[in-house]
From Swiss-Prot:
Lineage of source species: Bacteria, Pseudomonadati, Pseudomonadota, Alphaproteobacteria, Sphingomonadales
Obligatory cofactor(s): Mg(2+)
Protein name: Orotate phosphoribosyltransferase
Catalytic activity: orotidine 5'-phosphate + diphosphate = orotate + 5-phospho-alpha-D-ribose 1-diphosphate
InterPro entries: OPRT, Orotate_PRibTrfase_bac, PRibTrfase_dom, PRTase-like
Name of the encoding gene: pyrE
Protein species of origin: Novosphingobium aromaticivorans (strain ATCC 700278 / DSM 12444 / CCUG 56034 / CIP 105152 / NBRC 16084 / F199)
Amino acid sequence: MLEDEILSEFRASQALLEGHFLLSSGRHSAHYLQCARVLMDPMRASRLAAATAAKIPRDLRHQIQKVVSPAMGGVIIGHEMGRALGVEAMFVERPTGTFELRRGFALNPGEKVLMVEDVVTTGLSSREAIKAIEQAGGEVIAAAALVDRSAGAVDLGVPFFPLVALNFPTYAPDELPPELAATEAVKPGSRAKP
């Protein structure tokens, strides 16, 4: 899929939002990708996962034994990536603030894992998920995501294969441009308080 086709999928599902958003990283942005909306259509989710899987070099793809994604945002795309790769998919979650495998999920020692996210901005959640996977005995050999908001700047400590890399600027709270500072931020992500 070309970048225009990918963004067309986001626009068609009303997943590309504009306004003032407080990201889960604590940074602010005028753009937000609500991947839950783009993934709510199973056929679209399947297409995007297949295109993301195709970004991973064939020799590396064949080594992947499990897909693990962080809840909540990564659950659907992680499942679809498991389908695209023909391997089981599971997720880590934060019942007490730290990612861990639950619900009977387990990894065999040394099992080769692809960590899958929906969106990566600073990489904090991804690195936390990778740490949890390694603590559970898995070996993370690569990471993938629908969207790399860092436009290639993020370092996850493993090879990283995003479907698309976007450069939507993000800002620290004390560096907001006037147009964002003039409006209240909306916190739409998975770490938002109800």
